[in-house]
From Swiss-Prot:
Name the record gives this protein: Ubiquitin-ribosomal protein eL40z fusion protein
Pfam families xrefs: Ribosomal_L40e, ubiquitin
Gene: Ub-CEP52-1
GO biological-process terms attached to the record: modification-dependent protein catabolic process; protein ubiquitination; translation
Keywords: Cytoplasm, Isopeptide bond, Nucleus, Ribonucleoprotein, Ribosomal protein, Ubl conjugation
Family, as annotated: In the N-terminal section; belongs to the ubiquitin family.
Length: 129
């Protein structure tokens, strides 16, 4: 049977499948046609995300049905050592008491003209975890 896969760009892909095909198989066919790796594909039908191990019949996908292809967003956790480095970089600053400019940790005077290059600086407050 024939089904359609619509991408977010509006492009429609036509696939030849069987109702016994798994979602994995469909994703592999999409990869063959479009070059998108299966682990980056999310298929949506009737508002539901389709799970890899299940078949088209499980979701009652029939001939000429339209699936929607969405790309998976990759993001996630920052490694703890990088998180500590970012925290150190963002918190070890001096703040001008007049114009609130952020300055490097060893600053003696503000770099801004509007406060007259003030020497009234304080350390940036530490945020609590």
């Amino acid at each position: 049977m024939q089904i359609f896969v619509k991408t977010l760009t509006g492009k429609t892909i036509t696939l030849e499948v069987e109702s016994s095909d798994t979602i994995d198989n469909v994703k592999a066919k999409i990869q063959d046609k479009e070059g998108i790796p299966p682990d980056q594909q999310r298929l949506i039908f009737a508002g539901k995300q389709l799970e890899d191990g299940r078949t088209l019949a499980d979701y009652n996908i029939q001939k000429e049905s339209t699936l929607h292809l969405v790309l998976r967003l990759r993001g996630g956790i920052i490694e703890p050592s990088l998180q500590a480095l970012a925290r150190k970089y963002n918190q070890d600053k001096m703040i001008c008491r007049k114009c609130y400019a952020r300055l490097h940790p060893r600053a003696v005077n503000c770099r801004k003209k509007k406060c007259g290059h003030s020497n009234q600086l304080r350390p940036k407050k530490k945020i609590k975890n």
